[in-house]
Amino acid sequence: MQVLVDADACPVVVKEMLYRAAQRLEVCVTLVANKFLRTPPSRFIRALQVPAGFDAADDRIVELVIHGDLVITADIPLAAAALEKGAYVLDPRGSWFSRENIQERLTMRDVMEQLRSSGIDTGGPAPYAAQDGKAFAGQLDRFLARHVSP
């Protein structure tokens, strides 16, 4: 089992939690981004830089992910693709994507995109807050406790 991270928009606090988990549990964490990422020296942490381009990081994650992996992303289409390959998908705010909720989330994303393209200001996500980090940490810890042998 590996952890794949959609790192371009991933909050720093989430990356730091993942670095600590990688070291503590000796689980491979791979961060994928279209920019250079500085990561701590560790045989369990690697950064992959992909060429700049629409969905290049997402496409690389889909290539790498296998059944049973954990993907960290807020990108709904990427989450859908990872779920199709049998991965677990957690967003940086601590919410799980699942086969049961992905279609609803894709539909809502499409509706919001249509509203924005027609000129309606839909706002954006709320700023990342401490409670988001706590929710993510709790979900990550529970997942790793069930899926990684110490």
Curated annotation (Swiss-Prot):
Pfam families: DUF188. Signal peptide: none annotated. Coiled coil: none annotated. Belongs to the UPF0178 family. This is UPF0178 protein Reut_B5138. It comes from Cupriavidus pinatubonensis (strain JMP 134 / LMG 1197) (Cupriavidus necator (strain JMP 134)). The lineage of its organism: Bacteria, Pseudomonadati, Pseudomonadota, Betaproteobacteria, Burkholderiales.
